[in-house]
Swiss-Prot record:
It holds the Pfam family GHMP_kinases_N. Its EC number is 2.7.1.148. One of its GO terms (molecular function) is 4-(cytidine 5'-diphospho)-2-C-methyl-D-erythritol kinase activity. It catalyses: 4-CDP-2-C-methyl-D-erythritol + ATP = 4-CDP-2-C-methyl-D-erythritol 2-phosphate + ADP + H(+). The keyword Repressor does not apply. The active site is at K8, D132. Belongs to the GHMP kinase family. IspE subfamily. This is 4-diphosphocytidyl-2-C-methyl-D-erythritol kinase. The lineage of its organism: Bacteria, Pseudomonadati, Chlorobiota, Chlorobiia, Chlorobiales.
Amino acid sequence: MQAKAFAKINLGLFITGKRPDGYHNLETIFAPINWYDTITFEAADTISMSCTNLDLPVDENNLCIKAARALQQAAGVQHGIAMTLEKKVPFGAGLGGGSSDAATVLRVLNHLWQLNLPHATLHNIAVKLGADVPYFLFSKGIAYAGGIGDELEDLQTSLPFAILTVFPNEHIATVWAYKNFYRRFELQRPNLNTLVKNLCTTGNTSALPSFENDFEAAVFDHFPTVRDVKTMLMENGALYASLSGSGSALFGLFANEAEAYAAIESLPATYRTNITPARFVMDDGTGL
């Protein structure tokens, strides 16, 4: 079996406080993009993995291996699987590529191994693998996330804009981003849920500046090449541009795909780009 593992962008990301356990509470809107890894699953006696990107570990530290092991433990089985990851989504980019891979492994192996684990069990496994893994496991379109990013509300809608996503060849560690972002816990924030529902229903772009990303200012100060990408996007037709997650990837929303493609010409040729059509929803190709 073969499955696509799609990436995401964050449309707005508010860090609202720090928890006693050391994690931060946040609010964000997850939106899927048509940039994906492909995972091939083949029957085997043990769990193993190979990857087209030699920079990624394929040992027990890999999230795909961790996901398979977690399923084994939760179900009390010793089933095997041979996984091949065709890595296309940049890592260290704020696009959730590793989390999406892990969610895909959970979904596919729950089926292939005939475990039929309930939603709550899968959610508990997913959260331990990564805060945004539940989004990729249970949603296909836009979702509101609270808590540490694990409390989800599927909004049953999609963005009416083409999305140009840009990776400027910088890897920003999430740990670094949380240590260095400029704290604005006391700010009164707009309701992201209401904002994005209105945006998707009406296409009215006037509220787009309200979708701020709290990582952006610190990242831009430390990584000026990342800041420059946002400037290029806004100067070349983007209705809105922002950092995704903790970066370094950025995205621009465009009225149509033609304008998004035209904007690529303004970017350095070494930067990796992806265009997502309006109203995109995820379909991993498995029918699950």
